[in-house]
Amino acid sequence: MLRFNQKIFPKGAILMNHKNLLRILTATLLVAIFATVGLVYAKTAERTPEYALEKIIQAVNDKDGATLARYVDADALAAATYDEGTAILARDIEKLHALYPADWFFRHDTAFMTNYIAERRTDDLALISRTLDFYFHPSETPVTRVDGNAHWLANETRAFEDHYTAKLAGVEENGNTAIATIDITGDASDYGQLVPTLTVQAELTQQADGHYMLTRITNGEEIFYPIVKGIEDYWTLQGWQ
């Protein structure tokens, strides 16, 4: 059950191997956005971004896929987050290698990474989708190898549930869009200190009938490096690097 001001932000916990960095950067943010806006609102009008956030958290608590689909464009959110995150990854691959020389995954160049990402994009987005399926439907039994990976990632995500709190800092509206600012804070545990603080900005877009949908993260550039550091630190914490 999601609680006021508290839920997960899985950071690097769902890293299974270095190839998974591309998809993990996205899955981490998606689950964070779905799960961390667990805030209590006063009753609000239906056609407001605050109402949409309230319905999202209710849908997560109730495992209500139909309601979640009304207020979160999961495919658009996954694709946009993946594309921005992997574009930064390819662009900054040499910088990442300098920061983390022990990580063989960063020992490539931009051209290689661009091709690698293009080849993996469809499979990675499918894995992200299945990870979210298993996160919201924990009793589902994995069947395929991809299911097994996604199930493991979803379980690792849940392992972080008690280590992060989230607070809605504000909502700014501009025409038919709104930006929700969410401040995320880790506790004093090893997991909580993987990314001690992070501010995520999520865009909600008003639909034709007036209701708002969560569609993308707007500050991917800003949060990329703290998340990568969290992934690397998790890897070290587990003794795998």
Regions of interest found by a model, annotated:
Residues 4-15:
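Short, Lys/Arg-enriched N-terminal segments with co-localized hydrophobic residues
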Residues 15-30:
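N-terminal Sec-pathway targeting helices
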Residues 20, 77, 89, 98, ...:
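Short, surface-exposed, charged/polar-biased interaction segments
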Residues 26-119:
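Short, low-complexity N-terminal intrinsically disordered segments enriched in polar/charged residues
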Residues 91, 99, 119, 134, ...:
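Surface-exposed polar/charged interaction patches
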Residues 149-241:
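Low-complexity, intrinsically disordered terminal/linker segments enriched in charged
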